[in-house]
Amino acid sequence: MPGRSCVALVLLAAAVSCAVAQHAPPWTEDCRKSTYPPSGPTYRGAVPWYTINLDLPPYKRWHELMLDKAPVLKVIVNSLKNMINTFVPSGKIMQVVDEKLPGLLGNFPGPFEEEMKGIAAVTDIPLGEIISFNIFYELFTICTSIVAEDKKGHLIHGRNMDFGVFLGWNINNDTWVITEQLKPLTVNLDFQRNNKTVFKASSFAGYVGMLTGFKPGLFSLTLNERFSINGGYLGILEWILGKKDVMWIGFLTRTVLENSTSYEEAKNLLTKTKILAPAYFILGGNQSGEGCVITRDRKESLDVYELDAKQGRWYVVQTNYDRWKHPFFLDDRRTPAKMCLNRTSQENISFETMYDVLSTKPVLNKLTVYTTLIDVTKGQFETYLRDCPDPCIGW
């Protein structure tokens, strides 16, 4: 009990510190300028490209990529196992993962289960652990997404992928363990059919859903987690118990990227499809006004907040809180993002200035794995690994 009390006091102290720090220098800063093209201490490096051939059988599609990334995937899978075993030292949870999760196959939609089987085979990681690795992303995605329209009606979509909160803190270098281990797993993917691009995405090797992507010339899509009491854990439990009329959110976003042929079709599917976990879908199109944040409960859409430049709404910003509510006081990335967009102005929004906004603390923080910039009309899709050197807020 004394140990637990000590942990509680440490967490309380950290929370109070973050509450104060997030709104005061040096953990926040004036809006950054001239950070693009990426360089300097907040730039970790470029993200490699791989082609995923959709003409191959699903079992074989990921083999080339996973041969390269198997060693780093094993590192993060082992880290997650160690964290679980720390809380449940008996090892029974991992025993259930390894023995029971593969029995759920036959219940996943489309090609996803064959793809996961193929990844397990080529990496020599138990199939149950590959499945749990894919479930993992339904629960811990903490992000900032923005769609902005310039004075000419041109759209730019930007996002920071923040991931790994409370999943192990490295006291030696002040970083989140899982966040750092995800960086070498980050890949750009060119999904092709008949040697032609169907869509492009940034993802983590071993994950067959999609969190960030675009269909050149048509639309862009990012996914943010939505915290809710009626949340992902409940949805996963219901799914395990046999309720199969819902879609995994990462599988839905991939299905939309792969099959939808217009902004409106994508919006319709993202608005109406029953999903496993609450989420925000941030969607951008190819013409003026085509940008929105879809706030989803598991069964229905609660809100579709759209661009309306004529009414002065030339951007939409989404973090992980409903737009009509105040962000959690320990985690307000929305306010600084909006402040920097307003200072940038519609006249000056561009790839360069969008990167500036996403490089400003605390929009950029210790959880940030990568930043993506998308221009649907020009076919530009750029992803950069990020660092947030001290002093930098933990989230």
Curated annotation (Swiss-Prot):
One of its GO terms (biological process) is regulation of steroid biosynthetic process. Activated by Ca(2+), Mg(2+) and Na(+) cations. Inhibited by Zn(2+). Phosphatidylserine and phosphatidic acid stimulate while cardiolipin, phosphatidylcholine, lysophosphatidylcholine, phosphatidylethanolamine, phosphatidylinositol and sphingomyelin inhibit the reverse ceramide synthase activity. Phosphatidic acid, phosphatidylinositol and C16-ceramide inhibit the ceramidase/hydrolase activity. Broadly expressed with higher expression in heart. It is found in: Lysosome; Secreted. Its main location: other. Changing N195Q: No effect on ceramide catabolic process. Pathway: Lipid metabolism; sphingolipid metabolism. It catalyses: an N-acylsphing-4-enine + H2O = sphing-4-enine + a fatty acid; a beta-D-glucosyl-(1<->1')-N-acylsphing-4-enine + H2O = beta-D-glucosyl-(1<->1)-sphing-4-enine + a fatty acid; a globoside Gb3Cer + H2O = a lysoGb3 + a fatty acid; a globoside Gb3Cer (d18:1(4E)) + H2O = a lysoGb3(d18:1(4E)) + a fatty acid. Residues 1-21 form the signal peptide. It is linked to Farber lipogranulomatosis: An autosomal recessive lysosomal storage disorder characterized by subcutaneous lipid-loaded nodules, excruciating pain in the joints and extremities, and marked accumulation of ceramide in lysosomes. Disease severity is variable. The most severe disease subtype is a rare neonatal form with death occurring before 1 year of age. Heterodimer; disulfide-linked. The heterodimer is composed of the disulfide-linked alpha and beta chains produced by autocatalytic cleavage of the precursor. Isoform 2: May interact with NR5A1 in the nucleus; the direct interaction would negatively regulate NR5A1 transcriptional activity. Switches substrate specificity upon intralysosomal accumulation of glycosphingolips. Such is the case in Gaucher disease where the regular catabolism of glucosylceramide (GluCer) fails due to the lack of GBA1 activity, its accumulation triggers the alternative catabolism by acid ceramidase which deacylates GluCer producing a free fatty acid and glucosylsphingosine (glucosylsphing-4-enine, GluSph). Similarly, the intralysosomal accumulation of globoside Gb3 in Fabry disease due to an inactive GLA triggers its alternative catabolism by acid ceramidase, generating lysoGb3. Belongs to the acid ceramidase family. This is Acid ceramidase. It comes from Homo sapiens. The gene is ASAH1.
